[in-house]
Swiss-Prot record:
It comes from Rhodospirillum rubrum (strain ATCC 11170 / ATH 1.1.1 / DSM 467 / LMG 4362 / NCIMB 8255 / S1). This is Replication restart protein PriA. Residues 490-709 form the Helicase C-terminal domain. Zn(2+) 1 binds at C520, C523, C560, C563. One of its GO terms (cellular component) is primosome complex. Keywords: ATP-binding, DNA replication, DNA-binding, Helicase, Hydrolase, Isomerase, Metal-binding, Nucleotide-binding, Primosome, Zinc. ATP binds at G253, V254, T255, G256, S257, G258, K259, T260.
Length: 811
């Protein structure tokens, strides 16, 4: 039939020419559906290959899906709807399709829900409209242009100005390739007006050109820094792995050992072989230094991929990857699902980081899925960390991963000295408030709120940095009572000494905002989120109370919403804003800034902060966990951990492991160059295994204790866990479904089901939540067990059962 669309470039036909006039194909749609739908291929339409993107009708709308195979043939052809056409987009590569199927099966999720992550930018599925370009005109046109300038037919444009000659030289170096005007001007080192004038004179020919983005290619042969013997041995190991197909490798190195430069060598070798490389970072949107280091090493920036990119940037990045024009991608976990035509290496940096686990939608761990993606593609996956997860360590011990170790800091720098400050013996001291403008002067923190929070400080005892006060009466408005401090005398002295030496200090407190809890001193009411089982966190900088789970916010009230008493609300416990308030009082001459995810909101802000720290425009940084990852600031010689015990409490399986990793990482920010560093950790429990391991400088000491405890309980990595989270707006329905799942719980050797119980976050975003936890022996295949379990219970409308295989959060 005339006018039917042709296949996009890169596709081939699925069916032979003598096949039935209207063959049937299975099309997977990016929707949470049970499987692919059958569609017929109209007579005369090109017959698509597996992986081809197609437009199909779905109800009254049109969707773009992917041909997943031949149709099942269960529906009569006359009842099938026909394909509409093909978007101008390369087909999904076979390894990506296999990966989508694997992830869906492993996570017990619909394959269409996984496909949606691969087709996350619908606008990228169509080619951009062609744009105007310029190229060298034909000989006849060139002569006409010269005559128009009064030059006559002089050969070679001898009378052209030097700038115009450079423009034509660029075009001669790329015969037949049209340039955008701005690109041509940049390559020839002329202004845009020169190109415009040449076009008007007929010296350039206007043509339409593809508007696809082609990022500058990194130079794999650009010389890198001289590697140490340890680095060279590790780099050789990675290069060897590139010759051997799939393998998993653990690149473990102490903080400052130069792991990045080692895996840069593997990226360079991958580029020499003409293949693509992917680097996953836990918070790429906030990692300002990594792209700079890459550009310094390879002479070009990597293609970035993360959620804070604008729609246009995501569109062009997605298509650049799909068209093979993105040699190196650095991204967040979702970059795993980009359509690489020839991926040859995956690096997972900071592989231990919990940010690699997606909790919403399709729950998956990008660290583990990266290894699967590499296995399906037949190339290496490198997991890099100074504090590897216990799961990764166990895989290395069992021989599943090759273990490469960098035991020393690069360049002769020494590891920092770590000292525990026992707050029971040297508690923080109170301080008298003065006028306070906060870091950055008028643009910093807001001034304290008055008598209500001062009253709390006057009454509450200070045994711990996170102690909560008891309600008390308001003092006289004329009083200037002492406030609770969060910095102990030894830490204050160390900060003063470091600042006096012209060096920088990082005070670490992994808690955003001003105070984690606000209560009424009159009636004891605690301000809670109306949509979640969580306290509202005060953010005094902008006068708001915020829920850190759902995003709800409200102004800080002047009266208690429960009893109506005015000026009775008191903040409890410290956040980074409150710590900054004390630091500004104790170190008034220090230039100070706060680094948290709500103050450093994206790549530009992160880059600006990193530049200010590197240029020593800041003396004292007060930061959360975003300061613990990958930063290299040679002048930071003191790290003070304000609350080392934060995160150790609660029933989280990995609480101790995560605390050890985080504190070890933040300690690694100290003394990364020729100046020695020291780390002071405030704690009320210096005998805790985490604290003892940190003080000893021997992470293996902690891992040995942690592994023994997990193995005794058959917990991961020595056992399997699957969480079922039942949620809905109707509490009774949620409880009924949870109870039904409890009654239908699987039984058998190596299986145990805990629950149902209300989740610790019993309400989240207005939905009631219950949990069950399937605990299984290491060798049990849990997915068939879970599928059968779910099939035994009818799930009513409005109730959702979320399956989380290998959970890391138990909220």
């Amino acid at each position: 039939m005339a006018g039917l669309p042709a296949l996009p470039p890169g596709s081939r036909e699925l069916f032979p020419e003598d096949a039935h006039a209207e063959p049937v194909v299975a099309v997977l749609l990016p929707l949470p559906l049970a499987g692919a739908y059958d569609y017929k291929v109209p007579a005369g339409m090109a017959r698509p290959a597996v992986g081809t993107l197609v437009r199909v009708p779905l109800g009254r709308r049109e969707e773009i899906g992917v041909v997943w195979g031949a149709g099942a043939g269960e529906t009569p052809p006359e009842r099938l709807k026909p394909l509409i056409g093909f978007p101008e987009c390369p087909p999904l590569p076979a390894p990506l399709r296999a990966f989508i199927d694997w992830v869906a099966a492993y996570t017990v999720q619909p394959p269409g829900a996984v496909l949606r992550m691969a087709l996350s930018v619908p606008a990228a599925l169509e080619a951009p409209p062609p744009a105007l370009g310029w190229r060298r005109p034909s000989a006849g046109q060139r002569a006409a242009g010269q005559r128009a300038e009064g030059q006559g037919p002089l050969p070679g444009g001898a009378r052209l100005s030097p700038g115009r000659q450079r423009v034509l030289a660029v075009l001669d170096d790329h015969p037949g390739l049209p340039f955008a005007g701005a690109d041509l001007a940049r390559e020839a080192a002329v202004g845009p007006a020169v190109v415009a004038a040449m076009a008007k004179a007929g010296l350039l020919e206007a043509v339409t050109r593809s508007n696809e983005w082609s990022p500058q290619a990194p130079d794999a042969d650009r010389p890198g820094p001289l590697l140490s013997a340890d680095q060279q041995a590790a780099a050789d190991g990675l290069r060897t792995a590139l010759d051997q197909g799939f393998s998993g490798l653990l690149l473990e190195g102490v903080t400052g050992s130069g792991k990045t430069e080692v895996y840069f060598e593997a990226i360079a070798e991958t580029l020499r072989r003409g293949r693509q490389a992917l680097v996953l970072l836990p918070e790429i949107a906030l990692a300002a230094q990594w792209p700079r280091r890459f550009a310094d090493r390879f002479g070009a920036a990597p293609v970035q991929w993360h959620s804070q990119m604008g729609a246009a940037a995501r569109r062009r990045a997605w298509r650049a990857v799909a068209l093979g024009r993105a040699p190196v991608v650095v991204g967040a976990r979702s970059a795993l699902f980009l359509p690489y035509p020839d991926l040859g290496l995956i690096i997972v940096d900071e592989e231990h980081d919990s940010a690699f686990k997606q909790e919403e939608g399709v729950p998956y761990n990008a660290r583990d899925m990266a290894v699967v993606r590499a296995r399906l593609g037949g190339f290496p996956a490198v997991l890099a960390s100074a504090t590897p997860s216990l799961e990764t360590i166990e895989n290395a011990r069992q021989g599943r991963y090759r273990h490469l170790v960098l035991p020393r800091r690069h360049g002769g720098a020494e590891m920092p000295e770590i000292t525990l400050l026992d707050l029971r013996r040297a508690p923080p001291q109170k301080w008298l408030p003065t006028d306070f403008a906060g870091p950055g002067g008028s643009e910093g923190l807001a001034a304290p709120g008055g008598a209500n929070d001062e009253a709390e400080e006057q009454k509450a005892p200070p045994p711990s940095p996170t102690a909560s006060p008891s309600p008390t009466a308001s003092p006289s408005p004329m009083a200037r009572p002492a406030r609770l401090g969060w910095l102990s005398p030894p830490l204050i002295t160390a900060v003063e000494e470091t600042l006096a030496a012209g060096e920088q200090v990082l005070l670490f407190l992994n808690r955003r905002g001003y105070a984690p809890l606000t209560l009424c001193r009159s009636c004891g009411h605690r301000l809670k989120c109306p949509r979640c089982t969580a306290w509202l966190v005060e953010h005094r900088r902008d006068g708001r109370l915020r829920c850190h789970h759902c995003g709800y916010q409200q102004p800080i009230p002047e009266t208690c919403p429960a009893c109506g008493v005015a000026d009775s609300l008191a903040p409890c416990g410290p956040g980074v804003e409150r710590l900054a308030e004390e630091a500004a009082h104790r170190f008034p001459k220090a230039r100070m800034d706060v680094a948290a995810s709500d103050t450093v909101t994206g790549p530009k802000e992160a880059a600006a902060l990193a530049t200010r720290i590197a240029n020593h425009d800041i003396d004292l940084i007060i930061g959360t966990q975003i300061m613990a990852k990958g930063h290299h600031f040679p002048l930071i010689t003191l790290v003070g951990v304000v609350d080392g015990d934060l995160g150790l409490t609660g029933g989280d399986l990995r609480a101790s492991e995560r605390t050890h990793q985080l504190l070890h990482q933040v300690a690694g920010r100290a003394g990364r160059a020729e100046r020695p560093g020291r780390v002071l950790i405030q704690t009320v429990d210096p005998g805790h295994p985490v604290m003892e391991a940190l003080a000893s400088g021997d992470p293996a000491l902690f891992l040995e204790v942690e592994a023994a405890e997990r193995q005794a309980l058959a917990m991961p990595p020595f056992g399997r866990l699957v969480a079922l989270v039942i949620s809905g707006e109707d509490s009774a329905r949620v409880q009924a479904v949870a109870a039904a799942l409890g009654r239908a719980a699987p039984m058998g050797p190596g299986l145990d089901v805990l629950g149902p119980v209300p989740a610790p976050l019993a309400m989240l975003r207005g939905r009631h939540r219950h949990r069950l936890l399937l605990k299984a022996a290491r060798g049990v295949k849990v997915q068939p067990v879970v599928r059968h379990w779910l099939s035994l219970v009818s799930i009513p409308p409005g109730v959702k059962v979320q399956v989380d295989v290998d959970p890391i959060s138990f909220l």
